[in-house]
Design a protein with these regions (language model features):
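C-terminal outer-membrane/trafficking sorting elements
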Residues: 165-166, 287-336
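OB-fold nucleic-acid-binding modules
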Residues: 1-134, 298
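Contiguous mid-protein beta-loop-alpha structural module that forms a pocket-lining wall or clamp
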Residues: 1, 164-167, 190
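Short, exposed beta-strand-loop hairpins at the edges of beta-sheets
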Residues: 111-118, 267-268, 325-327
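A short, polar beta-strand/turn micro-motif
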Residues: 15, 19-41, 130-157, 180-246, ...
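Short, surface-exposed beta-edge/turn micro-motifs
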Residues: 52-54, 71, 185-189, 263-264, ...
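Append "Rare intracellular matches occur via the same short Y/T/C beta-strand/loop motifs
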Residues: 101-107, 188-192, 323-332
Length: 336
């Protein structure tokens, strides 16, 4: 509506309610009600400023949910802040939310008064689920962990996500790809870097595509590692035999498949490449992109005479090979 009006109102449960209205008012078709994005802190600290305004709060956690219409039992939280909700509109979709989901809620703030007690409240008009909380990812003292989910998820606050990719020089490197708050596409296997602690994973819906050059893979349940389309060596995030260097190391003898943990990521390398003959790679090397097939190959008494060129391609024999440098059992061999 547009125009000037004279109204009579009463205060009911802390809300100014119009009882009569007079004036020259023109109805506007298809009008859009302005909506202001606010935080819980905004509403709680100055409810009067936003009273009867249409506002929207984003990415807050549903602590309790409605069980019926005309229900005041639901609350949303943001850290230590908590706001009561009122399901006063029959069209409200908030009743469909799940506890612990991260939600966006649109409504009208007011001060609910009962028994001389005033409570800041948001009368819900509508809302939607932004993300659903899943089990937390544990980051150890080493400040690293891995993650893999069938659904998209938001990178936890304080965490950074890395993929593993070829560095174009016969080696691999960890590439910083997702910052805190970023939406990670479904089925994206990651190394996470964050201070020690448990980090909630908030699942979301997204059509974004996972990076296709990622050498990390994962499973949503405890399952044998497997990558289709070739023969692979498999590496698990763990410490080396000395227990002093965290990285990706063979999870089973000779890089064979191993049982991967639920929602964990692992590294898979084509067994025909020079890199796959390495027993493992420290995160320090991977983070700086200095890992190559030459300086990471680990020799053993039972190692076969595999031969590779400097691009990591395996060749059958040095007989008839073009002039150049080749790698055999981790040693450089010059063909003149």
């Amino acid at each position: 509506m547009n125009g000037v009006a004279t109204v009579t109102y009463v205060v009911f449960n802390g809300t100014n309610e119009i009882t009569s209205l007079e004036g020259d008012i023109t109805k506007e078709a298809d009008a859009t009600i302005p909506c202001t994005t606010v935080t819980l802190s905004d509403i709680l600290s100055n409810t009067a400023q936003y009273e009867s305004m249409r506002v929207k709060v984003e990415m807050v956690e549903a602590k309790d949910v409605f069980t019926s219409n005309d229900d005041r039992s639901a609350t949303i939280v943001d850290g230590d802040l908590e706001l009561s909700l009122y399901n006063g509109y029959g069209s409200s979709t908030y009743k469909e939310f799940r506890v612990n989901a991260y939600v966006n809620v649109t409504g009208y703030p007011y001060m609910y008064v009962k028994n001389s007690t005033s409570t800041p409240t948001l009368k819900v008009w509508t809302g939607d689920i932004e993300a659903v909380k899943d089990d937390a990812v544990n980051i150890t003292d080493a400040q690293y962990g891995t993650a893999y989910y069938a659904d998209a998820f938001f990178m936890p606050m304080g965490a950074t996500g890395y993929i593993a990719e070829s560095n174009g020089n016969g080696g691999i490197t960890l590439k910083e790809t997702y910052a805190e708050g970023d939406l990670v596409p479904a089925k994206t296997a990651l190394v996470l870097n964050a201070p020690k602690g448990n980090y909630d994973i908030c699942l979301a819906e997204s059509d974004a595509i996972a990076p296709t050059n990622n050498l990390l893979h994962g499973t949503t349940t405890e399952k044998l590692t497997e990558v289709e389309g070739g023969t692979y060596k498999y590496y698990k995030l763990s410490y080396n035999n000395e227990g002093n260097d965290l990285g990706f190391y063979w999870g089973s003898e000779n890089g064979a498949a191993f049982i991967n943990g639920a929602h964990k990521a692992y590294l898979a390398l084509d067994s025909e490449t020079l890199l796959s003959q390495s027993r493992g790679f420290s995160l320090a090397d991977l983070a700086h992109g200095v890992t190559t097939g030459i300086n990471t190959t680990v020799k053993s008494a039972t190692q076969s005479n595999f031969i590779y060129d400097l691009n990591g391609r395996r060749i059958n024999s040095l007989n008839g090979a073009a002039k150049g440098v080749y790698i055999m059992n981790g040693q450089k061999v010059l063909v003149k």
